[in-house]
């Protein structure tokens, strides 16, 4: 079910606090900037749930087309988003799936965001291949129905209003001063998407909201040009870790590997950019790069990050998942997911106390046939992968 405007229930909400109280009766707080939040302990649990007997499953969810995002609603419903713009829902942790539902006709923008205060989900949809008008749809029932809301996006200091096209899903912040903020990676196309000579005018950044998704602000640029299609996770100390594709660089080799950086102000600015020496950015025989997935497992007090991309010098194939146990400083482990066709991908993880608990989710372009394939696995399975030589496993995780 779709409507052109917000539902009557949404229009009559007097405050975000009122909305939150309708869905959650305890645990709501206010941060230093008077933003609503729920404590991290409501969303993060123990490591044990991810360390059950090794499990790995794959199934095909979509025929043809492309552009993945996978998110997990507050009740544990897994939503696989695809192309222009369809979703499939799973209420049993990713085992079985409802038939596909079209949110709206348009172009998949990536950047789906779950508001962990209200439980609402935001979908960003563009009228065509960006740059193009951006529309925001909101679901207040874990992705069953969707309503179009006003799109209010404020530019950054350069006057740029970015596009959301094919970034990884966004997140709700749980730690530090800005807990309660919604944030998602986005991008600025500069002069234009093509020709290639314009790539150096591109950059990535972020959109964030401090009022429950009613309005959004564009952050300052990630300080590396030629970037596009990025991911953001929050570390347990409140810093944000940023990881991005780069399809142009003055030195060609700098576009073969992922670039990362950090934010200490909730995603308004980005610092300490550096090139990875272990995380590839697509086929390393080219400088074009490849969208990858990124997630921090919801484990209290641990910064376990997972990243998805390919290990290839001959096209988009041979998908892998990498693991970091120190917030992205080192990536000592990887495991192959699929040896054949593998392109854009999105990662997420299950929520404690729901049917999704303990599962890691990967939606990617490729598989045995064209379209979208979905894998679910646990950390035990991933720990049986190969060592990269980049750091070592900590004692608390060594199998």
Stretches found by the model and what they are:
Residues 1-5:
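C-terminal segment of classical bacterial N-terminal signal peptides
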Residues 10-399:
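Asp-box/BNR beta-propeller blade signature and adjacent active/binding-site loops
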């Amino acid at each position: 079910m779709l409507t052109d405007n917000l539902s009557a229930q949404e229009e009559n909400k007097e405050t975000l606090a009122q909305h939150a109280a309708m869905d959650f009766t305890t645990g709501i707080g206010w941060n230093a900037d008077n933003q609503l939040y729920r404590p991290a302990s409501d969303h993060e649990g123990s490591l044990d749930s991810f360390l059950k007997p090794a499990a790995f499953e794959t199934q095909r969810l979509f025929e043809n087309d492309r552009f993945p995002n996978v998110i997990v609603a507050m009740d544990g419903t897994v939503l696989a988003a695809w192309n222009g713009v369809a979703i499939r829902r799973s209420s049993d942790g990713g085992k079985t799936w409802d038939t596909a539902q079209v949110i709206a006709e348009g172009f998949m923008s990536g950047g789906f965001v779950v508001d962990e205060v209200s439980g609402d989900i935001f979908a960003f949809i563009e009228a065509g291949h960006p740059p193009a008008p951006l529309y925001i749809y909101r679901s207040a029932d874990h992705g069953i129905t969707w309503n179009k809301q006003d799109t209010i996006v404020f530019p950054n200091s350069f006057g740029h209003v970015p596009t959301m096209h094919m970034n990884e899903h966004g997140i709700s912040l749980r730690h530090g001063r800005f807990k309660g903020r919604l944030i998602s990676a986005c991008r600025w196309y500069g002069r234009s998407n093509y020709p290639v000579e314009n790539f150096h005018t591109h950059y990535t950044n972020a959109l964030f909201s401090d009022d429950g998704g009613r309005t959004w602000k564009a952050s300052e640029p990630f300080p590396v040009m030629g970037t596009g299609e990025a991911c953001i996770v929050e570390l347990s100390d409140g810093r944000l870790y940023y990881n991005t594709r780069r399809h142009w660089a003055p030195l060609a080799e700098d576009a073969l590997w992922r670039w990362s950086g950090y934010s200490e102000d909730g995603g308004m600015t980005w610092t300490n950019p550096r090139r990875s020496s272990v995380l590839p950015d697509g086929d390393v025989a080219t400088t074009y790069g490849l969208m990858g997935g990124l997630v921090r497992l919801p484990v209290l007090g641990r910064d376990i990050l997972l990243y998805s991309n390919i290990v290839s010098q001959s096209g988009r194939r041979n998908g892998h998942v990498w693991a970091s146990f120190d917030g992205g400083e080192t990536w000592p482990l990887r495991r192959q997911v699929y040896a054949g066709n593998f392109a854009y991908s999105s990662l997420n993880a299950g929520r404690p106390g729901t049917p999704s608990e303990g599962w890691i989710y990967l939606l990617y372009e490729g598989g045995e046939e064209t379209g979208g394939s979905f894998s679910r696995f646990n950390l035990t399975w991933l720990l049986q992968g190969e060592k990269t030589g980049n750091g070592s496993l900590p004692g608390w995780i060594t199998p």
